[in-house]
Amino acid sequence: MTEAFYTDKSRVRASFDRAAATYDRAAVLQREVCDRMATRLDLIRHAPARVLDAGSGTGYGAGLLRARYPEAQVTELDLAPSMLRASRDKQLPQGRLRRLFARAPALVCADLEQLPLASGSLDMVWSSLALQWLNTPDAVLAEFHRVLRVDGLLMFATLGPDTLKELRQAFAGIDGATHVNQFIDMHDMGDALVRAGFATPVMDVERIVLTYDEVKAVMRDLKAIGAHNATAGRGRGLMGRQAWQRIEAAYDRLRQDGRLPATYEVVYGHAWRPAARPRRKLDDGRDIIEFHPHAPA
């Protein structure tokens, strides 16, 4: 990833903080991806006692997890405190007295790359559309591996490089700034899982296309969910009218059946934390790597 595409984490936090009040009205894609992730759980045999929703937003995914695993402790973790407050307000009952005696949900405001959780303390980590806000997956996957117990499950969805390809195309050549975040390829994500020590990773990808009447509606939806451009190479000033008209004209050429497409490439994956293999060493400190060739047919 080039320096221009590095994500400014403080801007990510500020953007989602501002969007907390409008997020649920615009988060159509986010809810759909959570629902599809939950459907994938039907194919996995796992009964977790402690679950982390990593990048929980306003709590939609955590609600699905609590419904599926009613005996489990589900902890919501997000970088933006206003998102967590929105989730808390939805869960607590109305009325001051009832709230006083209600059980508060488990909420943690923290960075995914520095989880304030004990090693081996979780049976499952769920993360829906949060990993794309990180510069590389390695640090966060190492943290997920650390906090999971042996045989713990990691399940996630993130965005692939074809996401918002129409918007990227419309902005191409306007100026030297970056206007759309860069997203990691599915195969690179699978490689990162293996590097982090996860076993039997399963990956798949699908494309979800939302449609709009005009370019401004695309931008309004992105703003409403807090999905601002947070790259280091973003423009710092306001865009002029002529530049914006060129963007609208370029995007309008992509219109299909009277509607403007906005493509999201959604990458799904799950993997397990295996038991650590004992490492054998020679007297001089070199590792022993066992090799068992197959017998010839």
Swiss-Prot record:
InterPro entries: BioC, Malonyl-ACP_OMT, Methyltransf_11, SAM-dependent_MTases_sf. This is Malonyl-[acyl-carrier protein] O-methyltransferase. Converts the free carboxyl group of a malonyl-thioester to its methyl ester by transfer of a methyl group from S-adenosyl-L-methionine (SAM). It allows to synthesize pimeloyl-ACP via the fatty acid synthetic pathway. One of its GO terms (biological process) is methylation. NCBIfam families: BioC. The keyword Ligase does not apply. Belongs to the methyltransferase superfamily. It comes from the Bacteria. Its EC number is 2.1.1.197. It catalyses: malonyl-[ACP] + S-adenosyl-L-methionine = malonyl-[ACP] methyl ester + S-adenosyl-L-homocysteine. Keywords: Biotin biosynthesis, Methyltransferase, S-adenosyl-L-methionine, Transferase. GO terms for molecular function: carboxyl-O-methyltransferase activity; malonyl-CoA methyltransferase activity; S-adenosylmethionine-dependent methyltransferase activity. Pathway: Cofactor biosynthesis; biotin biosynthesis. The gene is bioC. It comes from Laribacter hongkongensis (strain HLHK9).
